[in-house]
Every structure is written in structure tokens, then in C-alpha cells.
Amino acid sequence: MSRLGHFTGVFRVCGWGLGCSHGITYRFVNTLSGAESSPALPLKAENALLGALDMSSIEPTVYDLTAPEMEGRGRGTPGNARARAYIVSRLVNAGLAPLFEGAFGQPTFLERRGGSPYAVNVGAYLPAAKPTAGWIALVAHYDHLGVRSGSVHPGADDNAGAVAMLLALGDALGRARPPLRRHVVLLFSDAEEPPNVRTDRMGSAWFWRHPPFPLTTLHCALVFDLLAGPATPGARDAGLADVIFVLGAEASPGLARLARGVPPETSVEPLLLGLPLIEAYPFIPWRRFAQGDYHGLREQGRRPFLLVTGGRASTYHTAEDTPDTLDYAKLARVTRWVTRLLVHAAEDPRDLGWTDMVADPLADARAILRFHASTGNGSQFPWLLRRALAADRARVQALLHAWEAGAAPTAAEYRELTLIALRLQAALWHPAGWWFALW
């Protein structure tokens, strides 16, 4: 075992040319890189819920949510209101209970009596076997960019696919009605997209500040975004077409146990990553950039959560994010895996625990190398970027070799690792985008 397993010191993640006093403080752990737990056996409720799933509803739901009359579901628009009404009707038909004192909608920032809210969250839940039970929350934002520069941005992958998945799960919960240990919340948040992301104006941030249940009784939140984008040819060639990224499990052994303990689903490969790998930006080492609806929970509620995502496709935040581009077969497989995750989270008898500002460098390095295989021979990249990616891979291999041999990671090394991860994400998102993937 590396000395990391016994290391309890604190490092500041610094940027090039900047003093450590300006960096983010992470405590290095081996939560993910330590001994792995074996997948749990399927639970009775898990099999019942899987049997009640109707995968044929997912694709039509995505088409409904991206229809022209939805106008890209921009916050505060008629199209957003139509999408919200559609979601509410589905929850009513599923037989789920309204989450907000008899209502399915939660207005945010209602400035004056009779005024218009800034955004409206939608929520429903399946009651647990006992009224005094704790809660788990499954979260997917339903808003998108609306109309930008005269073009409707349909937002199929972002985030109609995840919404369709949760609605299919809601239908299954209503049909099977398994007597779970915890109440199961389905939250469809509003105002996730820019300019609201990472601000208190996010619908989910409002929800975490004004929860309909004591936040101390939240067992965990599972946040879903960008689940159905098509895999790149390199990812398919490397056997990574069904990879989904599960982020945040480094925060506690309980979360790691939960994420790793989900029984396997055909071809779905959950790749556990540390949140710092998606929250770093070049030249801004003193700030972390949250990437979704866990932001408010982390800042306000400080309860356990996982972010589950497929990552950005080339259509991300463009008018080409249309329903015909999604991989529905993959989304169906991911839905089955998420169903298993949901049941195991709802039935877990132990407190998960949660600690902020931790990182597992060994696990992150291994995950980067695993996904780096999707770059293939690099022929799709400009030569400068291809050279940088090759150098990055060699550097991660060298760091991992040193750490596995017993060297303790340093602040500068981990900052380097996060920027290597950022370059890999940027390169795979836009292979020709060398102007923002090189620094």
C-alpha cells in the first residue's frame, strides 16, 4: 500500500506562478484507491422495480420534451411552463405524492404576493414503509437554454434524457410501490443553466435551502445530467461506449461502498472520479467550479451526494443537441443501473457520512488513464494537441508509478493532475478545439 493510505496531511492545490496561499485546500485520502468492496446481491425491491420499468417510454418522452412548442425550455418562458406541466402530468399519472405541501411545484424567489417566481422546481415522492423514515433524492434539471441567437436549443442530452429516465423510474415506482426503507424523492429542478449555474438562483439551490423535509434526514442525493450523448468512435473502440462517470464518492467510505456495491448491469461501466477533476480551471487555482445541481447541497446542506453523468458530447449547448442524436439503448442500460443504485441507496441501513474538500490522487490517476484510451491514436486531434495529450498520459503514468511505490502526492502534482483531466475532457468534447485545450 502507498503511504497515501496512512496520510492525513493537508495540501493546497496551487497554480503555476501562484503562491500556495491562494490555492484550494484538499485533504488526500484513499477512499477509492483502497481495497474495493464487492457488488451486493440484488434486493427483492430491486427486482420488483426493474420488472416494472417500461423502457419504451424513454425515447418518446425525450421527443416530447424537445418538441418545438417547448422552445428549448428556457427558464421563465412559456416553453419551460409547458415542460413543467408535462412533467407534473406524468407524476400524477404515476400515482406519486406531491412533494410540496400538496403541490408538485415549488416556486423560487416569489418576490411579492401575486408576483411571478424566478423559477419553479417540480417534485414528487414515493412514501417509505414508515412515515418517520429518512429520504433519498434523485435530481435532474428540466430547464435548458431556450432560444439563443435565433436558434432553439432543444437540450435532448442536456437534460431531457435524464428527465425521461426519472419519469420512467417514477412510473415504475408507482406501479411496483416497493416498501422501501426511505422515502424516494424525484426532483426536477429549474434554473440550472447559465447564468444561474453556481449561484443561489439555481432552482436546486433554493430547494436545498427550503427543503420539504429536515435536511438532516437526507440519506443522500443522486444528481443526473448528460446521460445519453453518443460515444466517440475512440470510446467505442476502447470498449468505453457505456462508461458513466460517478463523482463524489471520494467524500466518504460509505459513498464509495454504495457506488461500488451496485450489482453490475450489462456493459455499463461506472467510472468513479473525484469531483476536483471536473471543477478545476486553468489559472484560477483558488476556486472550484461546481458542475451541476449538487452545488447548493454541498454549500448549504452538506449531506452526501453523487453526480452521475456521461460527460459532454460534441452537441453540448448547441442547437444540434436534438433527440435523434441520443443513444437510447445506452440510456436504457444506464436506467437499469440507476434503478439498482436507487434501491441500494434507499435500503442502505448505515449512515453514509460525508467530508468536503478531499481528493484521492491514486484513484483519479487510474481513472484518467482508463478514459485516456478513448483518444485512440490521436489522429482526430491537431498535432499540437495530440502531442500534449501524449505527454499528459506519460506524466500521469509516471505520477501513478511513484505514488504506488510509496511516494506521497504533493499539492503541485495534484493540481497538475486536475489540469490534465481538464485538457482530456476539453479535447474529447471538441477534438479540433486546440485553442482552449492548450495552456
PLM regions and their residue ranges:
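Acidic, Ser/Thr-rich low-complexity intrinsically disordered segments
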Residues: D351-H430
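Acidic/histidine-rich catalytic neighborhood of metal-dependent amide-processing enzymes
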Residues: G115-V120, G146-S252
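Active-site-adjacent substrate-binding region
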Residues: G102, C220-A221, L226-M357
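Extracytoplasmic/secreted proteins, especially bacterial periplasmic and envelope-associated proteins
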Residues: S57-P60, D64, P78-N93, A103, ...
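Solvent-exposed loop/turn segments at secondary-structure junctions
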Residues: M70-G72, L91, G114-G115, K130-P131, ...
